[in-house]
Structures are given as structure tokens and as C-alpha cells.
């Protein structure tokens, strides 16, 4: 936890423990063997992502010894080639190129008249032998790689096939999440008690094992060579007995029934029963709950089945009536597990919204107006569609499995090297002496940390535990202290270059290059933080507050001498704008964080690196669950077409007033984002609202920035303001009063999207003079707005 250092040392460092991971109320705290299991699982999960994203081939690693031998043999063949040239004398020295065939032909010609014909013949033989050995070892290395690819036919290498990678990404997060997060909070009144429910949960391992064994049988059948092929791809047929098509493929007889009764039904029984039992069972915080183990295994079985079946031509049937019924069962269990884990790690808001969309899917044919669809969707059709790249495996998971988890690993390395403490201490040294100093420190520190953190509420907990008590200490009302922290942490989500992962989701959805998005975000982010700074400064002036004394603050000179701790951030930004891929830039920055730590007392050795990967694995669970849950909503929108019909409403409104259409879009984006983490809020709003704005003729970048800003601002918009509520929990103020105050402090952000809609120069579009003029006039406008509000 973050602590206020009451015994200031000689350097007057204030921040101590900002980098420490906040503990959620329902997280299990293991000891001994349980801790080792979870830590190893989390570290392995994060490390495998880093390996996969950087294209390290699993089969190549296995074949590495043979590959080294082949390379040495190839080098020896090169040496034999040079020896033959030398043996040929002047003719060999005059030879150009590296063609073995031509050199051997030259040797044959030379031997007829040369005095050293025997020596030439021996050199030719040595060259042939060396080349044969190199070729044999190369074939052997290839055979090793191929053999392991066949043994792990469903997991051949890194980088994995895209769908397989995303399925395993979600499956691993489900397993880790259920083992780590309990169904209910471990509050003050919590008391573990023995229960027969543990025995019932243990019995649920039987249907889980039955389902897993069935999938293993499917996998063996597909890899046995008995499965039919069409166009070079193995096919998967799940047809009921008596089907005419089944008669042509007798090997698939019984698959349909097995998918229902031996895979689907046992899996759903175990899933739903374990969720119910988990809600009422009470297991000690340092022990695994059997119901959670069942849910973790269910998540892995779902992944195992989907990887198996999606590796065949059956993937082409996704979203149609021909989808295998087992996919519908797996998707039902998978979606249920995703929603349950989302409830555990992010609350009910997103789960309720997802539930509303699911209900809409199956009742849309009964509804009037723009919500209506012509034909009802069957259970098999919808769930056969939702666990695909049009839903759960779509843009949200694409981003969480690549950019987001990579930057979570980066953030974990920064935390392990205690860079977060330095950020906060640097902010105190730079701004602590200004009037209302701690509030201004909160703006800078929370903005920096929030940019990397990815969630407004999570950042409030991390930095607010330090800044909020200090703000109260210098005279801020507890309501205002919480509001400032909430507004500053929310601003981190719009601060380039990382933007709390929002920039990466926007790039994935729109296809706009990441660099262009990050550059466009600069002026709006400056306007937001200038506004918050002015609001804080005016409040401090109105209340006659002082800054902190110099003897209460870290020494600025010492902080400047440690400026090298910003090197990982600088490398990240520099690499991105040099045109490096996001993956490569993030990896370089992560490595830099470990290297820079050796210039500090917190040197990262092997143990610290493993700890960083463990921390990253744990930190990633919430965002992965949230993105997958948002993917369910995206799947509903893509199947029903409700987004297109919403666009038609916006077009009708725009015919009367474009400003009215924008205001309506703003309200929908905020409503959809209420109670949801930033990434999910934007992903859902982008699916519903952004297409309509684009159809109004608004440029795609402007439309998505408009939606993104209001999705972010839902975190400080009453009545459901996650960041404000988290801050109120620390400050001790009324949550609703805090959310109203944070809304007031961040009021400029509600105007900025309309500003860049009417003047695209604020998004760095236009000449340098236009951009400078737009930025300057916007800052003046923000100044007068802040003055008027205060």
C-alpha cells in the first residue's frame, strides 16, 4: 500500500510504496505452496505473451541445438569452399561469386592439367562432404521442428495463429482470475466456515474431466489422419444422426451427440453450478476454493475445444447456421465465465450492460422501431457467432492480447524498479512549493502514472493514497481532495503517448496509424490538464492556501540528478516516433527499465524480473476480462446491426441540428461508459456511436476522439463515476459529492471535444500557424471557463 512517510529522511522523500500493488477486497492472499503456484502461473502467463509477441518460435527453441550444429557445419562448408579456391591457384583466385557448381566445374577443368590434381580432388571431396553434412543437419533441424509442430499440432509455434493466440489469452486469464479472485469480498465480518459445498464442488470435477476427455478424443481424431480433408484443410462435421451429408462421411458419426452430451452439457452444468456455489461458499482467504478451481478448469476446457475445432475448416462456418453445436456450447460457457470474472474484478456495471445486450439479441424481433430485427436469432446462431473475431475475439481482445498486456508488463517493470516513487517525488520537488502544492503534484503524478496504468479508478488507488491525505493536510476539503485526484487520474487516460491503452484500441478499430493518433492527442490533453491546474490554483487562491515548505519536500537537485529514470519512457516515445512497431518499442522500453534499475538501489536481478512478470500477470486480469466482456457487446452489435440503425437516428437528428446530434452522441457515449473501465467504455461506444458520426461526414479521427473523450469522462460523471467513488473511499467524503466536484474540476474536458470538432487544428491538422493559433485561443478559452466556474 501507499504510505505517507512520517519520518522524513535526509532527502525528504515523500512517496514510498506508490509502486506497490493495491490489494482488491476479494483477492486471495496465498502463502507457501499456494503462493508459489499462483506466482509461477502469473509469471509464466505474462512471460509467454512477451515471448509470443516478439515472435520467438517454440519449435525453433526445441531444435536450437541441432540448428547450432547445422550452422557450424554450414560454416565448415564455407571454409571448404575457400580451401578449394586456394587449391586451384590463380584460377581459383580469379573465381568470382559463391556458386559451388561453377567452382566444381572449374576444378574439373583445372585437374586435367594441374600438377596437384590429387590435392584438388581431395578438396572437392572435402567440400562435398561438408555440404552433405550441413544439408543433413539442416534437414534434421527441420525435422525436429516439424515433429514438435505435429506433436503440438494445436499449438505449433510462436507467434501463434491469431485466433488460437487470442483464445489461449482469454483462457489463461480466466484460469488465473478465478484462482485469484473470490466471488465475494473478504470484509471485516468475513468468517471462513466448513461447508459441504466444497464436497459438491469437488464432485463437479467429474463433468469437467468428462468434457476435457471428450475434447481430447476430438483432438486425437483430427490428428490421426482419419479426418476428411477439403481443399487441403481438415474438416469438422457435427451433424445429427440421419443427416444426408453425414452418410458421405461415416467417420463423423456420433460427433454431434458427443458434442452435446459428453462435452456441452457437462461443461455447462459444471460452469453454472460452480458460479452458484462460489457465491455462497466461504473459504479462507489463503486457500483455493474448489468451486473456483472448477471454473478455472472450465475456462481451460473452453479454450482447448475452441483451439481444436477452429484449427479446422469449421472456422468458416462461424456466424452461420452451420456452426458446430459444440462451438455454441463452448461459447455459452466461455461468455458466462467472462461475465462472472468481470463481475469479480470490475463490478456489476459492465455485466449488467452486457446482460441487457444479450436480452436484446433474443428479443429484438419483438421490439418496435429501430431496435427491431426481421428474424429471431437462435441460441446456436448467436453463440456460434459471438466467440469469433466479430465478437469476443475481435478488436478488444486483439488489443488486450498485444498492446495492452505488453504495456502492463512495461508498467510492472517500472513498478519493480520503483520508478513510480521517483515520478511522484519528482512532481513534489517541482510543484510542491506552489500554493495548494499537493493538488498540483497530484495532477502531474497521477497524469504520468495514469497514462501507463490503464484504469482511472486503479490509478486513484495507487497515487491517491499518498496525494489525497496531503491535500487534506494543507487545507483542501476532503471532497475537493478526492475530486482533484479523480480528475487527474482520469486525465492520464487521454495523455499521449500511451493514453491508458486507448490509443492502441483506436488504432485497431480505425486503422489509423498509432503515431498519428498520439500526435493528435497532444493539444486536447494539454487543454485538459491546463484546465484542471487552473481550477486547482483558483481554489487554492480562494482559500488562501500555502504550498509545502522546502524542508517538507524532496530536494529538486537530487531529483534532477536521477532524471535517467525517465529513460524507459523516453526510449518508448522515441522508438514509436522513429516508426518502430508498438511491440518492438514496448519491448525495448521494458528492457530499458530493467537496465536503468541497475543505476539505483533497486536493481532488477532474475528474482525481481520474475516478480515483475508475476505482477504483470495479476495486473492484466481485469483489463483482459473487461475487454472480452466488451467483445460480447461488440458481437451483439455486429450481428444485429443496431449500430447502423443508431447511425440512422444520428443522421435524422443532424438534419435538424448537427450540434443536437453531437450532444446526443455525447450522452450515449457517457451512458455506455458509466461504471466501465476506459478500454471497455470506448470499445462499446466506438461500436455504437462512432459509425453514426462518421456517416455525418465527420472525419474518422475526429469522430473517434469525440467518442473516446466522453467514454473516458464517464469515470468522473455522476451518478456512476468509478474514479470519483474510488477517491471518495480514500478521502472519506460523500461519493456523490465527490463525483459532482470532480465533474466540475474536469468541466473543460466536456467542451474540448466540441472545440476540436469545429476546429480540426486542435488535432494537429492544418498548417503550423493554424495549429498554434487554435491552441493559443483554446487555452485562453479554457482559462476563462475555469475562472467562471470557480
Task: Outline where the language-model segments fall.
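Transmembrane alpha-helix interface/packing and boundary motifs in multi-pass membrane proteins
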Residues: 411-415, 446-455, 487-493, 576, ...
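Core transmembrane alpha-helical segments of multi-pass membrane transporters/permeases
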Residues: 97, 136, 340, 344-345, ...
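Long, contiguous bundles of hydrophobic transmembrane helices that form the permeation core
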Residues: 2-42, 61-65, 192-196, 201, ...
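Low-complexity, proline/glycine-enriched hydrophobic segments characteristic of transmembrane helices
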Residues: 54-162, 209, 221-254, 765
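Hydrophobic mid-bilayer segments of alpha-helices in multi-pass membrane transport proteins
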Residues: 36-43, 166-178, 198-208, 259-275, ...
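Transmembrane alpha-helix boundary signature
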Residues: 184-188, 217-227, 277-285, 304-320, ...
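Hydrophobic transmembrane alpha-helices that form the pore/transport pathway of multi-pass ion
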Residues: 424-492, 498-505, 511, 678-710, ...
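Membrane-interfacial loop-to-helix junctions in multi-pass transporters
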Residues: 323-329, 390-403, 430-442, 474-480, ...
Amino acid at each position: 500500500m501507499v504510505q505517507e512517510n512520517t519520518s522524513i529522511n535526509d532527502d525528504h522523500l515523500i512517496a514510498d510504496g506508490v509502486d506497490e500493488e493495491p490489494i482488491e477486497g476479494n483477492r486471495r492472499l496465498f502463502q507457501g505452496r499456494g503462493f508459489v503456484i499462483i506466482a509461477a502461473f502469473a509469471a509464466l502467463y505474462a512471460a509467454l505473451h512477451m515471448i509470443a509477441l516478439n515472435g520467438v518460435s517454440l519449435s525453433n527453441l526445441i531444435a536450437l541445438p541441432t540448428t547450432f550444429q547445422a550452422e557450424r557445419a554450414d560454416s565448415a562448408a564455407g571454409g571448404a569452399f575457400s580451401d578449394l579456391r586456394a587449391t586451384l591457384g590463380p584460377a581459383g583466385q580469379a573465381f568470382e561469386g559463391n556458386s559451388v557448381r561453377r567452382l566444381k566445374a572449374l576444378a574439373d577443368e583445372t585437374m586435367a592439367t594441374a600438377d596437384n590434381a590429387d590435392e584438388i580432388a581431395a578438396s572437392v571431396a572435402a567440400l562435398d562432404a561438408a555440404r552433405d553434412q550441413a544439408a543433413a543437419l539442416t534437414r534434421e533441424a527441420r525435422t525436429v521442428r516439424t515433429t514438435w509442430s505435429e506433436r503440438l499440432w494445436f499449438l505449433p509455434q510462436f507467434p501463434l495463429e491469431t485466433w488460437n493466440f487470442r483464445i489461449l489469452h482469454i483462457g489463461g486469464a480466466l484460469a488465473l482470475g478465478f484462482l485469484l479472485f473470490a466471488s465475494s469480498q473478504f470484509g471485516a465480518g468475513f468468517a471462513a466456515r466448513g461447508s459441504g459445498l466444497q464436497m459438491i464442488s469437488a464432485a463437479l470435477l467429474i463433468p469437467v474431466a468428462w468434457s476435457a476427455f471428450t475434447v481430447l478424443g476430438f483432438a486425437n481424431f483430427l490428428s490421426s489422419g482419419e479426418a476428411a480433408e477439403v481443399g487441403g484443410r481438415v474438416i469438422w462435421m457435427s451433424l445429427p444422426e440421419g443427416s444426408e451429408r453425414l452418410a458421405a462421411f461415416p467417420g463423423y458419426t456420433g460427433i454431434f451427440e458427443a458434442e452435446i452430451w459428453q462435452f456441452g452439457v457437462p461443461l455447462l452444468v459444471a460452469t453454472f453450478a460452480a458460479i452458484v456455489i462460489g457465491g455462497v461458499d466461504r473459504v479462507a482467504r489463503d486457500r483455493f476454493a474448489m468451486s473456483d478451481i472448477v471454473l478455472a478448469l472450465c475456462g481451460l476446457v473452453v479454450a482447448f475445444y475452441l483451439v481444436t475445432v477452429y484449427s479446422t475448416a469449421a472456422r468458416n462456418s462461424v456466424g452461420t447456421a452451420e456452426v458446430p453445436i459444440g462451438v455454441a456450447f463452448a461459447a455459452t460457457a466461455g461468455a458466462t465465465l467472462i461475465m462472472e470474472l468481470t463481475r469479480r474484478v470490475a463490478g456489476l456495471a459492465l455485466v449488467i450492460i452486457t446482460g441487457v445486450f444479450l436480452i436484446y439479441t433474443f428479443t429484438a424481433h419483438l421490439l418496435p422501431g429501430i431496435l427491431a430485427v426481421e428474424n429471431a436469432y437462435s441460441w446456436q446462431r448467436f453463440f456460434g457467432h459471438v466467440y469469433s473475431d466479430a465478437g469476443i475475439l475481435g478488436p478488444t481482445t486483439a488489443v488486450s492480447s498485444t498492446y495492452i498486456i505488453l504495456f502492463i508488463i512495461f508498467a510492472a517493470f517500472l513498478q519493480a524498479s520503483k520508478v513510480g516513487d521517483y515520478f511522484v517525488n519528482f512532481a513534489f520537488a517541482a510543484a510542491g512549493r506552489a500554493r495548494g502544492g499537493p493538488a498540483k503534484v497530484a495532477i502531474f503524478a497521477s497524469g504520468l502514472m495514469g497514462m501507463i496504468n490503464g484504469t482511472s479508478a486503479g490509478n486513484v488507488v495507487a497515487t491517491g493514497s499518498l496525494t489525497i491525505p496531503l491535500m487534506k493536510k494543507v487545507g483542501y476539503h476532503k471532497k475537493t481532495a478526492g475530486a482533484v485526484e479523480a480528475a487527474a487520474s482520469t486525465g492520464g487516460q487521454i495523455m499521449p503517448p500511451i493514453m491508458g491503452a486507448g490509443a492502441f484500441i483506436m488504432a485497431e478499430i480505425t486503422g489509423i496509424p498509432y503515431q498519428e493518433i498520439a500526435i493528435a492527442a497532444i493539444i486536447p490533453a494539454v487543454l485538459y490538464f491546463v484546465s484542471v491546474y487552473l481550477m486547482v490554483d483558483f481554489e487554492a487562491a480562494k482559500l488562501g492556501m500555502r504550498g509545502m515548505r522546502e524542508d517538507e519536500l524532496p530536494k529538486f537537485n537530487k531529483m534532477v540528478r536521477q532524471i535517467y529514470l525517465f529513460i524507459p519512457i523516453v526510449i518508448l516515445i522515441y522508438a514509436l516516433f522513429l516508426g518502430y512497431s508498438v511491440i518492438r518499442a514496448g519491448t525495448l522500453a521494458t528492457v530499458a527499465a530493467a537496465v536503468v534499475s541497475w543505476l539505483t538501489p533497486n536493481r532488477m536481478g532474475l528474482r525481481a524480473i520474475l516478480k515483475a512478470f508475476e505482477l504483470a500477470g495479476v495486473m492484466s486480469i481485469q483489463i483482459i476480462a473487461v475487454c472480452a466482456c466488451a467483445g460480447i457487446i461488440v458481437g451483439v452489435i455486429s450481428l444485429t446491426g443496431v449500430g447502423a440503425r443508431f447511425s440512422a437516428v444520428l443522421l435524422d437528428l443532424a438534419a435538424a441540428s448537427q450540434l443536437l446530434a453531437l450532444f446526443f452522441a455525447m450522452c450515449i457515449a457517457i451512458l455506455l461508459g458509466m461504471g466501465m473501465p476506459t478500454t471497455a467504455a470506448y470499445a462499446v461506444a466506438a461500436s455504437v456511436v462512432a459509425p453514426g458520426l462518421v456517416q455525418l461526414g465527420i472525419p474518422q479521427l475526429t469522430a473517434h476522439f469525440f467518442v473516446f473523450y466522453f467514454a473516458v469522462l464517464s469515470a468522473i460523471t455522476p451518478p456512476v463515476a468509478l474514479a470519483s467513488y474510488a477517491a471518495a473511499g480514500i478521502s472519506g467524503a460523500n461519493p456523490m459529492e465527490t463525483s459532482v466536484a470532480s465533474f466540475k474540476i474536469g468541466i473543460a474536458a466536456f467542451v474540448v471535444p466540441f472545440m476540436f470538432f469545429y476546429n480540426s487544428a486542435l488535432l494537429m491538422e492544418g498548417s503550423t500557424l493554424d495549429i498554434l493559433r487554435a491552441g493559443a485561443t483554446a487555452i485562453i478559452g479554457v482559462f476563462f471557463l475555469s475562472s467562471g466556474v470557480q
